[in-house]
Amino acid sequence: MQQLTEIVEQALVIIDQASDLKALDDIRVDYLGKKGKITDMMKMMGSLSPEEKPAFGQAVNDAKQAIQQKLTERIDGLKSAELEAKLIAEKIDVTLPGRTIEIGGLHPVTRTIERIETFFGELGFSVKQGPEIEDDFHNFDALNISEHHPARADHDTFYFNPKLMLRTQTSGVQIRTMETEKPPLRIISPGRVYRNDYDQTHTPMFHQVEGLLVDEHVNFAELKGVLHDFLRNFFEEDLQVRFRPSYFPFTEPSAEVDVMGKNGKWLEVLGCGMVHPNVLRSVGIDPEKYSGFAFGMGVERLTMLRYGVNDLRAFFENDLRFLKQFK
C-alpha cells in the first residue's frame, strides 16, 4: 500500500509540472496504460490472500481515479490557458479609431444637374431624355431653324451625313415630347450636347438643361417668375437679375438672362423666350389655343459661376486635386 501511495503522489507532482497536452498524454500512458505503473499494481492481486484483495483492489481504483481526475483538471487548465493566450493575441483594442472608408463625391457637373432637377421637380416639371444622335427635323426643322441658318454650318455641328448629326441642343427632346404627349406639358431635358468648339470657355461636348412649359394662357411674366426663383435658389442669394432682348429662331419674344456678379458686372447665365408659333405648329399643337415658354442653360457655365471655376476644361481632365474640392 505504501508503494501505491508513493506512485500516486509522484504522479500528481509530475502532472502539475506538465506544460503541454502531449506531456500529459505521456503521463497517462505511463501510469494508466496497459503497461503503466497502476496497471502493474493490479497484477499484485494474485499474491494476496482473499481477505486482502478487496481492500487492495479498492485502493488501486482510488489511485487510478485520483490520477485520472488530476489529469482531467490539468488538461482543462492547459486548454483554458491556451485559449486565453490566443484571445489576448487576437484581441481588438476598441479604443483605437476605426478604419474609415473614404467616400467619393459627385462630379460638380452632376451636382449641378441634380440641383436643377430638384428645383424644377418641385414645380411639377418631369425629366425627359432623348437620343444624342439626332435627325435634322428634330434638331433644326421643327425648331424653326431654316436650312441656311448659321447653326447648320459644318464648323458648328458634327454631321454623320446631311440628315444625321450629334445633337447641338436638347431641344429635340422637347419636340419628341410634344409629338407624343398633349398639353399641358412641363418638362426639363438635361443631357450632353455637341458643338465643334474648344477653348477656355467651350468644349466639343458639354451639358445642357432645357425646359418647356406649354398650356393655355402662358405668358412671359410667368417665365420671368420661374427663372427669377430658380436663379436665386441655385446661387443661394438674392441676386439682381435682368432680361435682355435677344433672338432665337424657336422663341418669340426671346431674351438672355444675366445676373449681377460680385465684381459688379453682368454675367450671362441662360436664354429663354415664348415658344414660337411655328414650333407648336410643327408638332401639331394649335398656337391659337396654347402658348408656352422655353429656356436653356449650359450646366458647365452655371457650375463655373457657382463654384468659382475659371477654366471649363477642368471639368473634363479628371484631376483628383480639383474634384476632391466638391466632396
Swiss-Prot record:
Please state the protein's primary subcellular location: cytoplasm
CDD domains named in the record: PheRS_alpha_core
Q: What protein name applies here?
A: Phenylalanine--tRNA ligase alpha subunit
Reading the lineage from the top rank, the first entry is Bacteria
* Annotated cofactor note: Binds 2 magnesium ions per tetramer.
Methyltransferase in keyword set: no
- Which keywords are on file for this protein? Aminoacyl-tRNA synthetase, ATP-binding, Cytoplasm, Ligase, Magnesium, Metal-binding, Nucleotide-binding, Protein biosynthesis
Tell me yes or no: is Protein biosynthesis among this UniProt entry's keywords.
Answer: yes
Q: Which family does it belong to?
A: Belongs to the class-II aminoacyl-tRNA synthetase family. Phe-tRNA synthetase alpha subunit type 1 subfamily.
What positions does the entry give for Mg(2+) binding? 252
Location relative to the cell: Cytoplasm
The species is Shewanella oneidensis (strain ATCC 700550 / JCM 31522 / CIP 106686 / LMG 19005 / NCIMB 14063 / MR-1)
